[in-house]
Amino acid sequence: MKAGALHCRCAKCFSLPVRKRVRKRASAVSLLSLPEELLVFVLQCLSAEDLLSVRAVHSHLCDIIDTNASIWARVSFKDRWPAPDTVWLFERAAEKGNFEAAVKLGIAYLYNEGPLLSEEGRADLCGRMASRYLSLSESLRSPQAEPFIWLFIRPPWSVSGSCCKAVVFDRLQAECQTSPGRKGTLLYCLARVLQLFDDEEKRDEAELMLKESSRCGSLQSSYLLWAISRASSTADPGRYLQCMRTLRDYAARGCWEAQLAFVKSCGSANPLGLEPRACSELVSQFFQTGPSALRYQPHLQGQDITTKRYILVDWLVEVTTTKDFSSQVLHVTISCVDRYLHLRSVPKAQLQLLGIACMVICTRFISKEILTIREAVWLTDNTYQYEDLVHMMGEVISVLDGKIRTPTVLDYGEVLLSLLPVERRTAHLFSYICELSLLCSPATVPGPARLASAILLLTRALHNYVPVWPVQLEENTGFSKQDLVSCALTLYIKCFGQDVPKDYRHVSLTGVKQRFEDDSYQQISKDTVMGFKELCHVLEVPEVEPQVEVSSTSGQITEMHTFLSSPTSSSKRRRADSMQAHRGAFVATPTAELSNQEETLLGDFLDWSLDTSCSGYEGDRESEGEKDGEISTMEVQMELPLDCADRQTHCCLLSSDDTSLCEEDEQEPPTGGSKPWTRHLSSSSTSSSSSSCGFCTDRHSSGYSSIQSFPSPTGSSALVSPQNPPGVPSQRIRRQVKRKNTAAHSAGEAEQEDDAANLAFLSF
């Protein structure tokens, strides 16, 4: 083709150059390319197992993990417990400042529920290791935080053989001489232990320890000394004035118990001679700076968890009534449960384990009479093993950062009733509504300060007090009547205007109502409550139709049965068949934790012995009341053996065994998305043993069972019910069926926020 000549655009004489695709080079940015500060932040969010896996990926990651103590201090040990092959990991994290690892190691060594130790010197070795890590865990907390490790070594102690509690006590006492920085906290813990003994000499020694601890800067010890000397200073006006000034100083320094005592004194009188307006501002500030309402994890929200929580609280109320614990123990227990669920998700099938573990902890922290671990397991119909409860106690303490006691509705209620006293029957109604409010989900009620004020407003309205919300209450709380009316009406609807939830047997859960039918509360729950329209008229608000929530239980009946039904003895993990059967030679102290009450009532039905029972110590086996012979009356009911022709049908109808569930799944396809939960509490082997099962019926009990069934060589079952109050014979045949012992994997954990800010207090 000549230059400049035209040509056609056919494919033969004209073609476009082929465009080549230029492949972009892959970016070389990876995890290793991130700045070290960002890498450290990412690694801090991993679990212990994931951290070890990442450590083995690259030498750079290995160096970062090994050289940064902050990573080990924040690594998570969620649902993990020290074992012989992982104890080194817990120890390394604890030495780097990991509170969770230190707490779990201390509890594991104390109860010998972790590393297997040699038989020689078992009590001394367990005690030394437990004291080391319990002391370490206490040192990792804020100096202003109230110490907690004393509740694990509090009496009763073992009266025969070596006691691990006594070893820990002696080791902590020796550490006071070698560690001056921890002396104040450790002396406070030792003094709290000695105060619980009946010996007068030990109580005098405890007071000397408190004085030494106060000189070392312990604010809690100073407040306890003030409480001891308060009674002797009331007679002299000058000494009483100085006493109240000292209390004001402790309150200004952040001691919450001192703040509560000071506010109550300001409400009932004016001990410092302040202006009335100044006293009102102090009390108002106490209410306005109270803790806010809690919210559960997104995984644990909805009608399902609300109903299950209602059943749990109702069952805990029954346990509190049966064991004659105070209402404060119940409120603090529910507070621990809600705060745990606020910070960490838990399988719904483990709610009962969480609840009873919180009650075991709170009784040791608040009450003189404790709920022993052995008895707590028995109250759950042996659905959980001894070690399961010990592990959950470690989880609760670590998640709550050792902060057990927080302000409750009862605390603010005491202040309100001191501001404006009411009649005794009105005070009982106030307490009744306070416990009914525990049944409400935390997402539907405000914080304890506003909630207590709303309950008092509702109480005064129901008993026709005029004015229903005086100016004195408004000035001292900072809440006007308009601020509280909405909450008061909501409480009325939830407590009195709705049908109470029912379990899968369609039995109403009325544990709180039965509790306040007692004569000690003047049978306040039997009173007729005024109607909603009349209440609106008393509160001077427009009459509106109450929005009553109707819970649809038809779609939850199958899942509710799985949640409540108790496993039969063929699927229940038996202690004698587990790997713990031969541990009698390795426990630190005697293993029996059975109270005298249980021994007297059960007799030969109990098939456990010192050789086959789980770990623990005899010093944890009975409360002070049981040692004094205060034995509650329980009824043992025998059920006649069934005929062979009817036995199979009877067991198929009443059993919640895994085999029965599998047979139902083969016959009917799964519907409604309800799936049986799988258990992952521990790695203990599950044993199966065949025995007959018998059940009793109680139309007024909670959905949880407090029944323990024991195998009988004759084929019948001996059922023991702790639900009857002492001295009251049973009127009905009891049937208490508990949920199945299964669990689902947790859906995740929200990062724990630091809520250690003290309440602000005015200083004069």
Swiss-Prot record:
Coiled-coil ranges per UniProt:
none
Provide the primary localization.
nucleus
* Localization per Swiss-Prot or TrEMBL: Nucleus; Cytoplasm, Perinuclear region; Cytoplasm, Cytoskeleton, Microtubule organizing center, Centrosome, Centriole
Query: For the motif Nuclear localization signal 1, what are the positions?
Result: 19-27
Q: Where is the composition biased (Polar residues)?
A: 702-722
Kindly provide the name given to this protein in its UniProt entry: Cyclin-F
One GO CC term of this entry?
A: cytoplasm
Q: Where is this region: PEST?
A: 583-738
Q: Which gene encodes it?
A: ccnf
Q: In which tissues is it expressed?
A: Expressed in the brain.
Question: A biological process (GO) annotation for this entry?
Answer: cell division
Biased composition (Basic residues) is annotated at 732-742
Short sequence motif named Nuclear localization signal 2, residue ranges: 570-575
Quote the entry's note on domains: The nuclear localization signals mediate the localization to the nucleus. The D box motifs (amino acid sequence RxxL) are involved in substrate binding, and may be ubiquitinated.
- Function summary: Substrate recognition component of a SCF (SKP1-CUL1-F-box protein) E3 ubiquitin-protein ligase complex which mediates the ubiquitination and subsequent proteasomal degradation of target proteins. The SCF(CCNF) E3 ubiquitin-protein ligase complex is an integral component of the ubiquitin proteasome system (UPS) and links proteasome degradation to the cell cycle. Mediates the substrate recognition and the proteasomal degradation of various target proteins during G2 phase involved in the regulation of cell cycle progression and in the maintenance of genome stability.
Superkingdom classification of source? Eukaryota
Q: Where is this region: Disordered?
A: 662-754
